[in-house]
Regions:
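Structured soluble/peripheral alpha/beta segments that form catalytic or ligand/cofactor-binding pockets
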Residues: 1-289
Length: 289
């Protein structure tokens, strides 16, 4: 579920003004088919505040009170109109503080108020409704410049630890130009908060598997990375269980955007103690055409 505010939103940005808002809901059915629901709003129907998390985009709203996010979402797609009424409750101390990521001439910001959270409420498509109770959820905020930008990202939840990794490439890095040492971070979070933030410089993708979405798209079957900081080090391995690809067009290059679900294992040493965990997560990457 995405509340998006930005420039040139909608099929005809010039006709609707310089900026606006979009609601985006993506639903994966039990048969593996993805359904997409959207709703665009002009600038006059958008409300947001840099001092709080409340956002209004047309008929859709999110309100944060006492740490709980209340979502009321309206969007439409080929399957009909979607309506969501949800409450998202982040788990205590399971967050990642705000950071701003720089690469040459662009700046992008990121914060994760709900690295691990639970969601409850009602979801409807047309006249069919269902309820969810205390299902696993995640919530983040992004801001800044994202034109011609690519990234590596992942968030996962184990028995003891939550993890988050990422890094952003500007247009030059996305085309394979330039060099940056250890451009990625890996954050490990437990019930007391951030336990360690490590650095790594590459992700090793292996194998091939068909992806849903874009025709002919091939996703990685697995990947690994190794993060270090001082004497601390961990190894993360992910087996991809499902992937969907979106064909993206940019001013300077063509690319495929992959959203993947999979299982992870984590092993290493933090603060002189062994760590080991496993669980499920969601991961994103790009591949050029």
């Amino acid at each position: 579920i995405t509340f998006l505010v930005g420039g040139g939103v909608g099929p005809s940005p010039a006709a609707s003004g310089r900026w606006g808002g979009r609601m985006l809901v993506t639903h994966r059915r039990p048969d593996g088919v993805y359904e997409r629901f959207t709703s665009d709003a002009p600038a006059g129907a958008v409300r947001f505040d840099t001092a709080r998390a409340d956002v209004t985009i047309g008929r859709s709203t999110v309100r944060q009170r006492n740490g709980v996010y209340a979502l009321d979402v309206h969007a439409a797609g080929n399957a009909g109109e979607a309506r969501l009424e949800l409450e998202v409750q982040p788990l205590r101390h399971r967050y990642f503080p705000p950071v701003e990521l720089r690469d040459d001439d662009f700046l992008s910001g990121y914060v994760v108020p709900g690295l691990a959270a639970s969601a409850s409420g009602r979801l409807c498509v047309r006249a069919r409704c269902g309820r969810v109770t205390d299902v696993a959820a995640y919530h983040d905020h992004n801001w800044g410049v994202w034109r011609d930008v690519t990234w590596e990202w992942g968030a996962a939840r184990g028995q003891e630890l939550s993890l988050l990794y990422g890094g952003v490439y500007g247009p030059e890095r996305a085309r394979g130009e330039g060099a940056v040492n250890s451009p990625f971070f890996l954050s490990l979070v437990d019930s007391l908060g951030v336990r360690q933030v490590l650095r790594f410089d590459r992700i090793a993708y292996e194998g091939e598997a068909p992806a849903a979405g874009a025709s002919g798209a091939i996703a990685p079957r697995r990947f690994t990375l190794a993060g270090t900081r001082g004497r601390d080090s961990v190894a993360l391995a992910v087996e991809v269980e499902h992937a969907v690809a979106t064909d993206m067009s940019a001013a300077s290059f063509r690319r495929l955007f992959f959203q993947m679900r999979g299982r992870f294992t984590l092993r290493g040493r933090i603060g002189g103690a062994e760590v080991s965990d496993s669980g499920q997560g969601f991961f994103e990457t790009y591949r050029t055409r």
